[in-house]
A protein has these predicted regions:
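A short, Lys/Arg-rich alpha-helix, primarily the initiator
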Residues: 1-17
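Residues within the helices of the helix-turn-helix
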Residues: 9, 20, 49
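DNA major-groove recognition helix of helix-turn-helix
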Residues: 37, 47, 66
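Short, basic-rich loop-to-helix N-cap that marks the start of a DNA-contacting helix
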Residues: 40-50
Length: 69
């Protein structure tokens, strides 16, 4: 199953956070984050939680950012 991360990418732009910066803040290598954003690998629950903390995403909005088709 593939997910559409355009809303997540938009939030990153709003916060002026690049993929490289986000990867470092959540403890991933930039290529690993890129693979996840391109549906080549899946996000782990802890990674989703950490991304929400960094980007100030409310728990009620997680579905729209991580599980949209």
């Amino acid at each position: 199953m593939t997910y559409n991360y355009s809303k997540l990418l938009g939030r990153m732009r709003e916060k002026n956070i690049t993929q490289e910066i986000l990867a470092k803040k959540i403890g991933l290598q930039p290529p690993t984050l890129s693979q996840k954003l391109n549906n080549k690998a899946k996000f782990k629950q802890a990674e989703i939680s950490n991304i929400c903390d960094v980007l100030d995403i409310d728990a009620k909005e997680i579905g729209g950012y991580f599980f949209a088709h």
